[in-house]
């Protein structure tokens, strides 16, 4: 199945290294390609301040986070390919990659795949859900040529 993807990438911060639009598109397509034929999605790259504000507002956690997912839910009678928005904090991704001894590219890919799975309805609150989501993430990330993101370095 081929995915018709409309991807809007918004850069609200700068950092040493960011994925290209093509990399983002590849990772999104890999994560959601078998779930739908058509998808619209926004990825917004933000600084720590914006991430912290959004995380505090929507999750009640007053600190920046790596990725926030905002699924779009249309009324049942309206069919739209709008999947939702991902907000990714570049500084948090950089820090986590360094702490976890991963390449920036591998960790960015993981955050995009992780966020897309949330947009598709996956979650990791309950242990069983977390196992299912992490297993799928690992499969998708390894399919992109990266190592298991949950394997200890």
Curated annotation (Swiss-Prot):
GO terms for cellular component: cytoplasm. Its EC number is 3.1.-.-. Keywords: Cytoplasm, Endonuclease, Hydrolase, Metal-binding, Nuclease, Ribosome biogenesis, rRNA processing, Zinc. Its main location: cytoplasm. Zn(2+) binds at residues 114, 118, 124. The keyword Metal-binding applies. It holds the Pfam family YbeY. It comes from the Bacteria. One of its GO terms (biological process) is rRNA processing. The keyword Metal-binding applies. Its cofactor is Zn(2+). NCBIfam families: rRNA maturation RNase YbeY (TIGR00043). Single strand-specific metallo-endoribonuclease involved in late-stage 70S ribosome quality control and in maturation of the 3' terminus of the 16S rRNA. This is Endoribonuclease YbeY. It comes from Shewanella baltica (strain OS195). The gene is ybeY.
């Amino acid at each position: 199945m081929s995915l018709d993807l409309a991807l809007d990438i918004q850069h609200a911060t700068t950092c040493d290294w960011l994925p290209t639009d093509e990399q983002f598109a590849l990772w999104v397509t890999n994560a959601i390609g078998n779930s739908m034929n058509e998808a619209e999605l926004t990825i917004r790259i933000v600084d720590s301040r914006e991430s912290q504000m959004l995380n505090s507002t929507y999750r009640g956690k007053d600190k920046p986070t790596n990725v926030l997912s905002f699924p779009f839910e249309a009324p049942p009678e309206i069919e739209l390919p709008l999947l939702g928005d991902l907000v990714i904090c570049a500084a948090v991704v950089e820090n986590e990659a360094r702490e976890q001894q991963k390449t920036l590219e591998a960790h960015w890919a993981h955050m995009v795949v992780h966020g897309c799975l949330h947009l598709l309805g996956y979650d990791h609150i309950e242990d069983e859900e977390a196992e299912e989501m992490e297993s799928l993430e690992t499969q998708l990330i390894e399919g992109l040529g990266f190592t298991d993101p949950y394997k200890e370095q």
